Regions:
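A short helix-coil junction within the Rossmann-fold of NAD(P)-dependent oxidoreductases
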Residues: 26, 113-122, 168
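Short, flexible catalytic-loop segment of classical short-chain dehydrogenase/reductase
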Residues: 179-189
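Rossmann-fold cofactor-recognition segment
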Residues: 43-58
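A short, exposed helix-loop element centered on a Lys and neighboring polar residues
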Residues: 111-112, 159
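Catalytic loop of short-chain dehydrogenase/reductase
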Residues: 80, 87-101, 123-167, 180
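Conserved glycine-rich Rossmann-like NAD(P)H-binding loop of the short-chain dehydrogenase/reductase
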Residues: 24-42
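N-terminal Rossmann NAD(P)H-binding glycine-rich loop of SDR-like oxidoreductase domains
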Residues: 8-25
Length: 195
């Protein structure tokens, strides 16, 4: 059985680092490529860690062009959540634009340069962490305008990836994951504010 090659973007965060640690323990995994804006605290012979600005398209292009192999799994664990609006009165255009950018552009750019790196000879997976609050049909509480809109946009990006990649890679599976609320630097400020 071939050994898996896995890429994890956002590997210094709570979920990303946990995924890195989990995958390096699996016998069927050859290498885990950990990408993050900060140093990833995962030390293991299977882990190859890189510091990467997800919004630096030139850097993403360079790194992807230097990779001469395919990935079996690509996971994106990147996002932002700051001071969600409880009412439309709380909306701030600059914060809205920042939220949309933070929760969509990294996945778009990673997809642009790394979707072609998915293994075309066997089942390969590309997943991005999203959030259930991005669901239009599941929104019964309202509020959180910027975050909800950014996650809805991310969900549409993931759906578009799935449609497009299926035309060229019949073995690929593209999907979004809803991890729920995970204790982390991302969710802690919201929990404190809502107490």
């Amino acid at each position: 059985m071939d050994q898996l090659k896995i890429a994890i973007f956002g590997s210094s965060g709570a979920i990303g680092s946990a995924l890195c640690r989990k995958y390096i323990q699996q016998e069927n995994v050859e290498k885990v490529y950990c990408f993050s804006r900060q140093i990833t605290e995962v030390k293991h012979e299977k882990a190859h860690c890189f510091i990467l600005d997800y919004l630096d398209e030139e850097n993403l292009s360079t790194i992807s062009s230097e990779i001469n192999f395919s990935f079996d799994i690509i996971l994106i664990s990147i996002g932002a959540l700051l001071n969600p609006e409880k009412s439309i009165k709380d909306l701030n255009v600059e914060k809205f634009n920042n939220m949309i950018s933070a929760n969509t552009l990294p996945t778009l750019l990673i997809g642009k340069y790394f979707l072609p790196k998915l293994n075309k000879n066997r089942i390969s997976k590309f997943a991005s962490l999203s959030a259930r609050v991005g669901s239009i049909s599941d929104n019964f509480l309202g509020g959180w305008y910027s975050y909800r809109a950014s996650k809805s946009a991310l969900n549409m990006i993931i759906k578009n990836f799935s449609i497009e990649i299926n035309r060229t890679n019949k073995y690929s599976i593209i999907f979004g994951l809803h991890p729920g609320t995970v204790p982390s630097k991302l969710s802690d400020p919201v929990k404190i504010k809502n107490k």
